[in-house]
Regions:
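Glycine- and acidic
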Residues: 14-19, 40-46, 99-103, 141-152
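Internal hydrophobic scaffold segments of catalytic domains
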Residues: 49-59, 97, 108-114, 169
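Single conserved hydrophobic/aromatic residue that forms the stacking wall/gate
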Residues: 160-169
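Accessory N-terminal region flanking or inserted into the helicase ATPase core
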Residues: 2, 109-159
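Short, compositionally biased low-complexity segments
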Residues: 2-8, 87-94, 130-137
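Charged/polar, solvent-exposed surface patches and flexible loops
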Residues: 17, 34-37, 62, 112, ...
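Walker A/P-loop-proximal flanking segment of P-loop NTPase domains
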Residues: 1-65, 70-81
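P-loop NTPase motor core
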Residues: 65, 69-127
Length: 169
């Protein structure tokens, strides 16, 4: 019987794609349990380039994201943690911003690229503008993130303005 080899995920940083297309993968899903068991207000992931930081962040997003595809975790080690999966999987809005694609010769160009990244992520949460939980100030602040010509001063506060409306979750 001939054994079919899985493809190597060279350059793939999207956990859902990696799982859906059956790439070879070293199961690091217990990182999720480790983070929940050793909860900290801030977690800093330091590793050299090409060590899977973005893929791990994508895995965290896939796990926690509202209405995420739970099939991504079928057969993984974390799926055996039934209680943990019931409590946390697919229950939260997840803000996912990677700055690794910002490569510019000038500060202005880098700032423009950062604006586009934040703008794209804010669009994913546009539905929050319909929430009755948000004040008009919060809605106005959030709307400023949706403008393609966002000001640099708005960019500086963008993580606050994206995350504040998700707080009730």
């Amino acid at each position: 019987m001939k054994q079919i080899k899985k493809k190597l995920p060279i350059g793939i940083e999207n956990f859902a794609k990696l799982q859906a297309e059956d790439f070879y993968y070293v199961d690091k899903t217990m990182l999720i349990k480790e983070l929940l068991d050793n909860w900290a207000e801030v977690n800093l992931f330091t590793r050299p380039r090409r060590f899977g930081k973005t893929l791990n962040m994508s895995m965290l997003k896939a796990f926690f994201e509202l209405n995420g595809d739970k099939n991504c975790f079928k057969g993984t080690r974390i799926s055996r943690e039934v209680y943990l999966c019931e409590q946390y999987m697919g229950k939260f809005p997840v803000i996912f911003i990677s700055l690794k694609s910002i490569s510019a010769q000038t500060y202005e160009k880098a700032c423009d690229m950062a604006i586009q990244i934040v703008n794209g992520e804010a669009r994913r949460f546009q539905y929050l503008l319909d929430s009755e939980r948000l004040t008009e100030y919060d809605k106005d602040a959030f709307k400023s993130l949706l403008l393609p010509d966002m000001k640099e001063s708005v960019l500086c506060l963008s993580l606050i303005h994206i995350s504040e409306p998700t707080r009730p979750y």
